[in-house]
């Protein structure tokens, strides 16, 4: 019962954090000269998803691992911001991802040598850079943006080895299925598509289930 009550309370914190994420995203969009949307999923989605995820992580970790819960909640909030901003604007912001990468690099020192997290993040980023360049060369169109490359590097810093492999696999599979669905729906396999949300979902799944 204690864990349930704590999870409910932390879910409320997540709802508030999600609202702040949306508020900040609107401000950042305007700095990028982008017009934010105000559809229900855009306005309420971050709060709902953050509340759900914060509650799940709180129930799993409990009060015995409070510092770890706070840290993971911050990373989850970054992924939530990426999901909704990239879906809305097809953009992953340097103003969000670079500070998050710095925090993840420091946090990676917690349970591994200083170079391990950096090496994993760099490797993940380079893999996606290669996929981006190769895909663009073969298809004559941008397949993965540099935002996806930076997101992959952030995931590597957060998850470390070997969990980054699982997260990228989940993200790529989810993204491929969604891309085919969007292509069929729009009757064009060259439709604009955001891969970042699916990479972020893969990272969240691994962070919760295996890490």
Regions found by a protein language model. Name each.
Residues 1-211:
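A membrane-topology feature that recognizes alpha-helical transmembrane segments
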């Amino acid at each position: 019962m204690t864990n349930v009550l704590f999870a409910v309370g932390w879910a409320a914190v997540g709802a508030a954090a999600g609202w702040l994420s949306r508020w900040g995203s609107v401000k950042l969009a305007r700095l990028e000269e982008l017009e934010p949307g105000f559809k229900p999923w855009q306005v309420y989605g971050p709060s709902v998803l953050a509340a759900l995820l914060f509650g799940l992580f709180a129930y799993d970790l409990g009060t015995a691992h409070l510092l770890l819960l706070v840290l993971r909640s911050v990373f989850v909030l970054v992924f939530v911001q990426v999901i909704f901003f990239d879906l809305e604007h097809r953009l992953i912001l340097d103003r969000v991802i670079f500070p998050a990468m710095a925090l993840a690099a420091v946090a990676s020192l917690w349970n591994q040598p200083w170079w391990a997290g950096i090496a994993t993040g760099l490797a993940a980023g380079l893999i996606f850079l290669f996929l981006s360049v190769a895909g663009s060369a073969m298809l004559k169109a941008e397949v993965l943006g540099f935002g996806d490359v930076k997101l992959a590097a952030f995931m590597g810093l957060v998850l470390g080895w070997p969990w980054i492999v699982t997260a990228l696999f989940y993200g790529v599979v989810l993204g491929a299925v969604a891309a085919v669905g969007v292509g069929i729906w729009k009757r064009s396999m060259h439709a604009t598509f955001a891969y970042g949300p699916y990479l972020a979902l893969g990272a969240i799944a691994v962070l919760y289930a295996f890490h």
